[in-house]
């Protein structure tokens, strides 16, 4: 409750004049203690204004109005990405650490979680640098992963991702294999494999 004594700027407003009040709040956690997720969360605001109208012509009277607003809370949609030689569904080959002129393969794994709202038409995209080769192996094969060689772009068409994915049910995951052929200029460096 804001009263005129606490907000002198709103104590008296001339016709057409505006005032402003700011406040902060925190929402409840979207994940409950039992690990269930609050789906399609919203915050409903009802703001009630009350004041006295003072006019030389019309005298005084009470003016009241209410405004109701709803704020929809976005989903937390996160991607975790790893590149590994030893872990994942593929057997990798090549020297470790990598050596100039010899290809070393890695498994790139992506994992998606989604908190509180269903997401439609989700897509994850990444680019392979010129020194990284797409090998064409994807697991599971049912996931829609494609590679555009002209752009060096890997694309994962997830489509619909339900609320709670990765929190109340298993994360959505996919892995693909790449080959890295280091050059002399990369000796002693840690080259980026996927961006």
Show where each model-derived region lies.
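Exported/extracytosolic protein signature
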Residues: 1-195
